[in-house]
């Protein structure tokens, strides 16, 4: 009998756990590896890795970044697997690729693997930085198609074919350094369809929803082993169970947090956190209140309506002197975010990790690094307090790795019953439905475990 006999069968399209293959999979609200043991993520953003690694003279900077990250316990890097058009393209025109840039991405993956760091690779951008959806629409226009808005990216047949070709090209790429196809490399944790998808042409979220419903299964058809996420910031829409009153400024961004993450081929949920930008001009207390409401709402919604893991894939606090921000305020924000992640993770909740924006190196050591400063950068070698906060959090999460996901599910269920039970007496709206959904989710999880055990120990014998 296999020692992995109790690994749960995932829902349709969810990435399955293959014993010993090192691929990250999902088990309820937890990420798991190998024999269904939990893994939590303390991560960073470094969008610039591929661009830097494309220049052999600068590859040392990429190696140093991974080395510093690993030394502080970080085990996840989120970075770009795209550069659409422009001066440093990965894809210079539809279907035409820059081999030098691709070899830079090869190096990033190989170096991450060497340092034990997983990669969350993003496939395009909502914004025009490094091309994104605007460049795809321009390419279609240059080919004679009458498109009038960047948001035509989500509906144009020709544009969608361009993007699907990019997906297939990246996922089937064979790394020139390791000889492993991207789609088979366990170093890659997951594919992110787009960085921060928004659609002002359709505030209801229907256009983005339809696009995700088409693209997420397409990714799975090319690569059925890796996880997929849309890349949402967490903004709510007009759909069912959407807490739209929590959106910054109370407006719609053309996405539905709950509905879009319910797409069959989506494996986990994401949110971003930038209270000082989203609530421009607000006080520190107002931002802290927003942060608590935002995270609590998404944790509860994810547990109740999605039953999948949740990551804060970007969080940041700027240090612009013009608005009086300083490192003490930034470090307080780091404490808030990381404490919330650990509180959820330690109780078996769905919020199981995050990635700060952004990791940079000392510009005096690495030429050109100062040009990447955006006010959010964290340079571990020069900010000892931030480095200490991040390192301690990494150690806390690492201590939680390797648990049985079913045990965490039962612990989380018990905790939620206690917390929600207290709120029921206050007439808390949807709390009864929330509780019932959580109980049902754990029942389904237990049923899958029993079914898997029967199949592997009796039917397959």
From Swiss-Prot:
Catalytic activity reported: Random hydrolysis of (1->4)-beta-D-mannosidic linkages in mannans, galactomannans and glucomannans
Short name of one Pfam family: Cellulase
Enzyme class, spelled out: hydrolase
Swiss-Prot/TrEMBL keywords: Glycosidase, Hydrolase
Entry annotation: catalytic residues: 196 (proton donor), 314 (nucleophile)
Tissues with expression: Ubiquitous.
Any Gene Ontology biological process: polysaccharide catabolic process
Keyword DNA damage: no
Enzyme Commission code: 3.2.1.78
Binding site for substrate: 80, 195, 274, 357, 364
GO MF annotations in UniProt: mannan endo-1,4-beta-mannosidase activity
Entry similarity comment: Belongs to the glycosyl hydrolase 5 (cellulase A) family.
Protein's name in the database: Mannan endo-1,4-beta-mannosidase 4
Source organism per UniProt: Oryza sativa subsp. japonica
The gene coding this protein: MAN4
